[in-house]
Amino acid sequence: MKKLIPILEKIPEVELPVKEITFKEKLKWTGIVLVLYFIMGCIDVYTAGAQIPAIFEFWQTITASRIGTLITLGIGPIVTAGIIMQLLVGSGIIQMDLSIPENRALFQGCQKLLSIIMCFVEAVLFVGAGAFGILTPLLAFLVIIQIAFGSIILIYLDEIVSKYGIGSGIGLFIAAGVSQTIFVGALGPEGYLWKFLNSLIQGVPNIEYIAPIIGTIIVFLMVVYAECMRVEIPLAHGRIKGAVGKYPIKFVYVSNIPVILAAALFANIQLWGLALYRMGIPILGHYEGGRAVDGIAYYLSTPYGLSSVISDPIHAIVYMIAMIITCVMFGIFWVETTGLDPKSMAKRIGSLGMAIKGFRKSEKAIEHRLKRYIPPLTVMSSAFVGFLATIANFIGALGGGTGVLLTVSIVYRMYEQLLREKVSELHPAIAKLLNK
């Protein structure tokens, strides 16, 4: 991978801020990027007036995209590149110690290069899968260039948010897209709330209209409750006698990352399956009306709503098992490749002069203690978010069960970061501690 360094150095990047970014500036940059994202979602791609198959509606929820516009691919290329790199490193095909800062920077650079390549690969797949109807070779080329270029812009908008804003661009785009879907679905002119009230006035209340809203609220409460659960490890300062503290480890240790990666993987399987089917190679399944009807693609497609679950319970069970296993796998890979493993966390705690209360001061002792919590929490939290996302899909929550889960989790994390940013600005001493 080191042979790619000359190429990586030539890829444009958003420079790191030369000075500390204030809270107001972070809000400003986050707002600017959000506005640009919505503007791009309103700019139609030339010749993109064809009917969109139902499969691409699922792609929109997971990848924060809007088919037929500049953000047709959404964050798909970014997430797909992340999946590929995670699998390559996690499986040992690429030998790389990501605890070394230089290796981690190289890993991120290669992931960015792969993201740009995937912009063009997925653009070709979309056109080949018939997302824009039947096009002449010239028009197909123009559409590919437009949607690939739009996705490359999103890559750099994600960088801007990561370096100058609050949270990450990926999370921001998903939350924005799903929130819009929930608002329109519940309170729009044809929203479920008005339909339910109308049926109530007519004396024949229809529970089907209010069920998606109730499902969304249930998912919201469950995610917030899970985000508040944590394990606290008592710490003692090695130099200041009597100084104690606590190191909190959240139950949802890996956040929503496993669900994002798993859902994106399943969406890519649908996309590849449809493209191959149109080429006469139905190895992933056959399709009717843009939806898989058999094969791997069918069993990894989302059964949305209770009616779908009841009509084919085997499909629902296989999908749930696959989602949970995939989330656990990506959760483990994510912890190992992002420095959240016990060894890396022990180094961070040790560098602050802290030690586990009641144990001798050494990174090995801290690591041994953390191994009792981090690996089990990684597996349990990954399985939990996978299970919850699946149940939310089965209930038929607005914005898609997976989308609601991701949005609530993302917004909650952004809320926590906003509080930290505000406290840091008011109390500089606390800022130093939080940064460490």
Curated annotation (Swiss-Prot):
Intramembrane residue segments, as ranges: 56-63, 64-69, 70-88
BP term (GO), one: SRP-dependent cotranslational protein targeting to membrane, translocation
Gene Ontology cellular component list: plasma membrane
PROSITE patterns, sorted: SECY_1, SECY_2
Ranges facing Extracellular side: 47-55, 130-140, 192-209, 278-312, 398
Family assignment from sequence similarity: Belongs to the SecY/SEC61-alpha family.
Identification of the protein by name: Protein translocase subunit SecY
Source organism: Methanocaldococcus jannaschii (strain ATCC 43067 / DSM 2661 / JAL-1 / JCM 10045 / NBRC 100440)
Encoding gene (name): secY
